[in-house]
Amino acid sequence: MKKALFIALVAILSVFTALPALAQSCCTLPKNATDYIAKHFNGYEINFFEKDRDVLDVDYTVYVRNGKLSYKLEFDKKGNVTDIESESRGLPLPQSVLPANVVQYVKGAFPNAKVTEWSKDGNKQLVELNNDMELVFNAKGKFLRIDD
């Protein structure tokens, strides 16, 4: 009985000792992602991030915050940004994260609107405005249509 209890105690202690190393190795962001955050969200604090593994793919979700400004960022396995969403009730995304063609089109066509979400889906870029309108652009930032 004492031997079984001792083995169980050693096993539990081993697990708790290994957890910090395991957490660090499974939850480090790719360099492209950390560079992107440093460039576009300098001064923001990373509140939380997770690594999501599917059968064939890996992606990362990162939440950054600076005062009242909060954003959710998603990256692919190489650290390329795939989605940016404002978590701050209608507050816009930083213009630096958007392609120049997209910024120019939105300013010209919807001068009172702000971009609150951007995502890349294959060869398309999807943009959501604070008026709930969704715009579709090609990979180069050329406007294609308003999405229903």
Set out the residue ranges of the language-model regions.
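Bacterial Sec-dependent N-terminal signal peptides
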Residues: 1-27, 37
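Phosphate-end processing signature that detects enzymes handling 5′-triphosphorylated RNA
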Residues: 24-31, 61-63, 88-92, 104, ...
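Short, non-transmembrane alpha-helical segments in secretory-pathway proteins
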Residues: 25-47, 93-114
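Exposed beta-strand-loop-beta-strand "reactive/processing" segments of non-cytosolic proteins
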Residues: 45-73, 118-136
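Intrinsically disordered, low-complexity Ser/Thr-rich linker and spacer segments
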Residues: 69, 84-97
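A short, surface-exposed beta-strand/turn
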Residues: 69-85, 135-147
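Flexible "stalk/tail and boundary" regions
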Residues: 103-109, 113-114, 120-125, 139-148
